[in-house]
Amino acid sequence: MKEDIKGFIAETAFADPREIQEDTLLFEEGIFDSMGLLNLISFLEENYGVRTDDTDLVEDNFRNLRAIEDFVSRKKS
């Protein structure tokens, strides 16, 4: 899952996937913006069946790859 999400982020942000590590701060390092987040949410819904509501839209859930993976795992269980 992590590599798929990383690949999606790299592709949509025109970033080198090697620069995106598990703890890379996606927003603070300018890799991600609000449009990128919307695209990611759609990707997670389509590929992992994760439904996101307004209370989920906090930076802690999407701060880095580790946080995104944890978020998906929580939502799927």
Question: Where are these predicted regions, by residue range?
Answer:
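Thiotemplate assembly-line natural product biosynthesis machinery
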Residues: 1-18, 70-77
